């Protein structure tokens, strides 16, 4: 997928004027790219548009104009773009009870190690590869970045909406498997095609 450059970024003052229209577009896009795996885990599959939105929001919130700092943000988010034959997602552990955040998060220690989150298509599975640095022995982050590298035959299954495709998480006492809607699979296929341009 083509990297986001400084020329793609709207200065935050101008972005403020366009923000509502931009947000409506991204909210609609994210609805097709977001899936809940049970009551706690959500995956949002990222692409150039979703990441550009996050960059714009960060620059706006922090009032960043310095070209060096803008480039720093671009570097962080460009690293999350899917590469060739790859899907990239943000995994969120969503805990709404503020008093139990640490206790509940601790139950997910180790989620980012081993074969815990998978896309399953026609009997084949591809496990998510988590970005490092989001947990250590005593603490786990609520936000993770995950990459999936589906095989060519899995990609063909994504395109055939008569064949089932699921996403599964299996960690400790948390077991969920959810069917992926056709709209999400269409987004995946676009990402996999776009990734070839990276």
Which residues does each predicted region cover?
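Long, contiguous binding/interaction regions
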Residues: 1-88, 95-198
